[in-house]
Design a protein with these regions (language model features):
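Iron-associated oxidoreductase/ferritin-like identity signal
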Residues: 2-3, 10-11, 119, 135, ...
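N-terminal basic, low-complexity leaders that serve as flexible interaction/assembly modules and, when applicable
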Residues: 2-102, 139, 312, 320, ...
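Short, flexible, mixed-charge acidic loops at enzyme active sites
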Residues: 45-47, 96-111, 163-174, 289-290
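Short glycine/proline- and acidic residue-enriched helix-loop micro-motifs
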Residues: 52-54, 115-125, 180-187
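Short gly/ser-rich anion-binding loops that grip negatively charged ligand groups
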Residues: 55, 59, 63, 119-130, ...
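Short, flexible active-site-proximal loops enriched in glycine and acidic residues
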Residues: 80, 109, 149-151
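A gly/proline- and charged-residue-enriched helix-loop-helix capping module
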Residues: 103-143
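Active-site loop segments of alpha/beta catalytic cores
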Residues: 129-364
Length: 364
């Protein structure tokens, strides 16, 4: 594709349902994509994963990452695609040595325990140390339908920090929370360092072809309000503001799971949209943030493990709850789970499409 064609395609994507919804502009029907839409619920994903041999090889091989990114687009025709990668790539290239243990999830060979561990963290060059990610973005952009926007993403500084301190996942992230309390200066340094590195990483994704960006704050909800503002919100706000200064036309979605108490503060970061989990109604979120941001969400993922009738009603209820007017991107309240039958996603997509095309009427 020559430069003129590439520019034209970018402009067309800016007018897509997904991008218009993020700008709170009118659309013909509610756009839909799903968090973790490329994943283990799809047989084609499992086949590619088996071919790769392990998760890091899958995520770190541009051709394979492109293949699994495209699979849900080819099957369901979602209104947006999201890069297949992992939020822990950055600490991995900082030397913490990431691995994935079956049944246990991510593990780091090295962890953050002392202030010196933070001071010794390198600043990776995203076009060098994470070059495979950028090559995947470039390849996906080439292979995606020209009109389909591509979402780049990263983990929030706090969420990434939890894994770096704990050495893996945790039920309550007590070690990470204790680090904030006992080593607040080192913790702030860690969050600031991760914010700078994440900003560079996301800017590189934009330069490589991403049309929109998303920050996942999976574990902000484990923090007290004061700790959330100091160690989670501030890091995300720094990332949003720096990227917006350089790319005001690139929308940023913040998804902070379990953080309904902080919706107003999250909307004030300067982001264009907030992801909402299923513990908050869209109508309440909309009332609280007004017209400052679009909303994305928020179907409980377990609905997709039920029946077609339950899915149809739950989707209709979600759309009814948002109500009339622009600014809604349909999604789940968290990632799709491996036990979801692929045909249930067909029901989900069809119900969203039909609701907005007039084949379904709002429930009363």
């Amino acid at each position: 594709m020559n430069e003129s064609s590439s520019t034209s395609a970018r402009m067309n994507r800016r007018e897509s349902r997904f991008m218009r919804a993020l700008r709170r502009e009118p659309v013909d029907q509610t756009p839909i994509w799903l968090m973790r839409q490329a994943g283990r619920y799809l047989p084609e994903y499992r086949a590619t994963r088996a071919k790769a041999g392990d998760f890091l090889t899958l995520a770190g091989t541009p051709e394979l990452a492109c293949e699994v990114t495209l699979q849900p687009i080819q099957r369901y025709g979602f209104d947006a695609s999201i890069l297949f990668s992992d939020i822990l790539i950055l600490p991995h290239v900082m030397g913490l040595e990431l691995s994935f243990t079956p049944g246990e999830g991510p593990k780091f060979a090295r962890t953050i325990r002392h202030p010196d561990d933070v001071r010794n963290l390198p600043t990776p060059d995203p076009m060098n140390e994470t070059r495979a990610v950028m090559q995947a973005v470039e390849l996906i952009r080439q292979e995606l339908p020209a009109e389909t926007p591509l979402i780049g993403f990263a983990g929030s500084p706090w969420t990434v920090a939890t894994y770096m301190i704990e050495g893996g996942s945790s039920k309550d992230f007590a070690k990470a929370r204790r680090f904030l309390l006992q080593q607040p200066e080192a913790a702030e340094h860690l969050i600031q360092h991760l914010a700078r590195c994440t900003t560079d990483y996301l800017l590189a994704q934009v330069a490589s072809g991403a049309d929109a960006l998303m920050l996942f704050d999976s574990w902000g909800g484990v923090l007290s309000p004061s700790l959330f503002h100091r160690f989670s919100l501030n890091g995300m706000k720094s990332i949003v503001q720096t990227i917006q200064q350089q790319h005001p036309d690139v929308p940023i979605i913040l998804f902070a799971k379990g953080c309904a108490f902080h919706l107003e503060a999250l909307a004030d970061t300067g982001c264009q949209a907030l992801g909402i989990d299923w513990t908050t109604t869209l109508s309440d979120a909309r009332r609280r943030v007004g017209d400052r941001v679009a909303l994305q969400g928020n179907l409980d993922p377990v609905v997709l493990t039920s029946s077609a009738a339950v899915i149809e009603q739950a989707v209709q209820d979600t759309l009814d709850d948002y109500g009339e007017g622009p600014g809604h991107v349909f999604n789940l309240g968290h990632g799709i789970t491996p036990d979801v039958p692929p045909e249930h996603v067909d029901v989900l997509v069809e119900t969203v499409r039909n609701y907005r095309s007039g084949k379904l009427t709002p429930s009363t």
